[in-house]
């Protein structure tokens, strides 16, 4: 497919036309003694709340399983000199907002005098059964209209609960950091499935109808890797692990739930210790879902034979992947890794960015965090990012293993590929940033990652 006029302009103008990026790197990042702290915070509300993530209103106090926020504090030091810092937080929520992240950065600044609060960032697992933090959607006439509801915790009230509980968790994680080691691992589990179907006329839908006679193919690819970071104390006892999966957690329907992440956590803790912290991270997965499109009836029959739920089946697959990787990770622990953390402010072209008067694109401001930890890189973005973009970043990265964390720092909606836009339908038409902006996001993320390696 030929490039559009705007894409050609973005390439020609480079950063000037496509992205204003502000960060600096002074030489190769330094290695230092790693210090790690953890906290896991229960963010399950005790009142009725509106759940976010569906096209209809769901108000409930029913709890299928708890929703949590997991706080991971990282620091490297050379003696008493601090080299680098980060606090990252994973939420069992459908989205993250700039308001919530800004509020938690303020909480960190109030509570911690030896931490740069700009190096705190928050991401969401994209559970469709988490309490809403989008109060602009709950007014009269809006999708989640609460104007006639009584005894409901509003999103504004729930955000205050997050500030209080997670603020305390931030302090707990930071103040408990101790000398530690880290290792990475790579396993595999079939969790995410591409959910966009293409038909012979060139159209596409986000759905499950493969029985149509004009069904042609699944539009995009799938990534069945389970990327892992293990963290160990000074006695080489595991304290927690970060799991990165290219799939939103949206099996559940009506009750408060962390979705498949809950049985993943419980399964790992049952094998390796109840004290473990499990940090859930969703990779680029805007066109993915945890339900199989092809062989769906056979998959359902197999879970019925096993007498387990589908989310338990997904969790079992992930736990088996951890089991497989565990011995390799335990044998390669680093206590003095290279650690670098950059906060990047990007201005990315929006989907209607061609301006006839100025011949320049209008921009969407985006915050991205890029980290190097040993051989591993991590790059965040605030989108429901289609998988292809994540694969592009991973493929071009100098890191041995590259983690992508979507819906982090904010929520800017879907970022579809050019082929998805051509096919149309939900997720490919309701977006702020399109393929031109996706190209800029990839290029700038790769540039930031690769600048951390010689």
Roles of regions detected by a PLM:
Residues 4, 21, 194-195:
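Short, intrinsically disordered low-complexity segments
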Residues 5-8, 393:
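N-terminal export leaders
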Residues 27-277, 281-284, 288-302, 306-313, ...:
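Conserved beta-alpha junction segments in alpha/beta enzyme cores
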Residues 3-4, 27:
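Trimeric beta-solenoid/beta-helix "fiber body" segments of extracellular/virion adhesins
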Residues 7-22:
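Bacterial N-terminal signal peptides
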């Amino acid at each position: 497919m030929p490039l559009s006029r705007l894409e050609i302009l973005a390439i020609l103008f480079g950063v000037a036309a496509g992205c204003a990026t502000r960060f600096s790197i002074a030489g190769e990042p330094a290695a230092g003694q790693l210090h790690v702290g953890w906290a896991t915070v229960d963010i399950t509300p005790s009142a009725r709340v509106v759940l976010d993530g569906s096209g209809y209103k769901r108000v409930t106090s029913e709890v299928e399983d708890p929703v949590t926020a997991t706080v991971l504090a990282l620091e490297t030091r050379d003696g008493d000199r601090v080299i680098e810092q980060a606090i990252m937080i994973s939420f069992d929520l459908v989205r993250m907002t700039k308001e919530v992240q800004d509020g938690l950065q303020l909480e960190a600044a109030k509570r911690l005098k030896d931490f740069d609060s700009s190096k705190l960032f928050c991401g969401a697992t994209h559970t469709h059964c988490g309490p809403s933090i989008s109060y602009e959607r709950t007014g009269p006439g809006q999708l989640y209209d609460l104007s006639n509801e009584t005894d409901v915790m509003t999103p504004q009230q729930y955000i205050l609960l997050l500030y209080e509980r997670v603020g305390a968790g931030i302090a707990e994680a930071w103040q408990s950091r101790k000398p530690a080691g880290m290792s990475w691992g790579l396993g595999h589990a079939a969790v995410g499935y591409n959910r966009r179907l293409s038909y012979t006329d060139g159209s596409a839908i986000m759905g499950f109808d493969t029985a149509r006679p004009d069904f042609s193919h699944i539009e995009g690819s799938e990534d069945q890797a389970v990327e892992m970071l293990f963290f160990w104390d000074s006695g080489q006892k595991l304290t927690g692990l970060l799991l990165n999966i290219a799939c939103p957690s949206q099996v559940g329907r009506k009750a408060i739930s962390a979705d498949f992440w809950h049985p993943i956590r419980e399964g790992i803790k049952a094998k390796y210790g109840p004290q473990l912290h499990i940090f859930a991270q969703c990779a680029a997965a805007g066109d993915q879902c945890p339900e199989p499109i092809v062989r769906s009836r056979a998959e359902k029959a197999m879970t019925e034979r096993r007498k387990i739920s589908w989310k338990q089946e997904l969790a079992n697959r992930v736990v088996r992947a951890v089991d497989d990787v565990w011995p390799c990770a335990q044998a390669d622990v680093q206590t003095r890794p290279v650690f670098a953390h950059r906060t990047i402010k990007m201005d990315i072209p929006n989907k209607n960015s061609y301006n006839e008067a100025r011949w320049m694109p209008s921009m969407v401001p985006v915050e991205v965090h890029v980290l190097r930890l040993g051989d591993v890189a991590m790059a965040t973005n605030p989108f429901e990012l289609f998988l292809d973009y994540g694969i592009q970043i991973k493929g071009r990265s100098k890191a041995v293993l590259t983690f992508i964390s979507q819906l982090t720092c904010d929520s800017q909606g879907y970022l579809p590929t050019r082929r998805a836009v051509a096919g149309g339908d939900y997720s490919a038409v309701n977006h702020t940033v399109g393929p031109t902006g996706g190209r800029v996001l990839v290029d700038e993320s790769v540039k930031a990652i690769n600048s951390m390696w010689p």
